[in-house]
Swiss-Prot record:
Residues 54-75 are annotated as: Disordered. It is found in: Cell membrane; Secreted, Extracellular space, Apoplast. GO terms for cellular component: apoplast; plasma membrane. Brassicaceae-specific phytocytokine (plant endogenous peptide released into the apoplast) perceived by MIK2 in a BAK1/SERK3 and SERK4 coreceptors-dependent manner, that modulates various physiological and antimicrobial processes including growth prevention and reactive oxygen species (ROS) response regulation. Inhibits root growth. Residues 1-25 form the signal peptide. The lineage of its organism: Eukaryota, Viridiplantae, Streptophyta, Embryophyta, Tracheophyta. This is Serine rich endogenous peptide 20.
Length: 75
């Protein structure tokens, strides 16, 4: 009976101490209105959507010496 009581008390202590650790380890969420500088916060999807980066398409084509030899052979 003594071992069972000691085991239950130990497990309860470990469970309760683990709960306080998870509360302390949580990351606090900041709404977009609270953000001051871009360098401080984590780059998430909302920041990436806000940044508009324009890039022109590629003008590359096939090499002039590549006739039919560049195409893969299919059985």
């Amino acid at each position: 009976m003594y071992k069972l009581t000691l085991c239950i008390l130990t497990l309860s202590f470990l469970l309760l101490s683990g709960l306080s650790n998870t509360v302390l380890a949580r990351v606090q969420y900041e709404s977009p209105s609270q953000r001051n500088k871009i360098g401080k916060e984590v780059w998430d999807q909302t920041l990436l959507r806000d940044l508009k980066i324009g890039a022109s398409g590629s003008n590359s084509g096939r090499a002039p010496s590549c006739n039919n030899s560049c195409k893969p052979n299919r059985p």
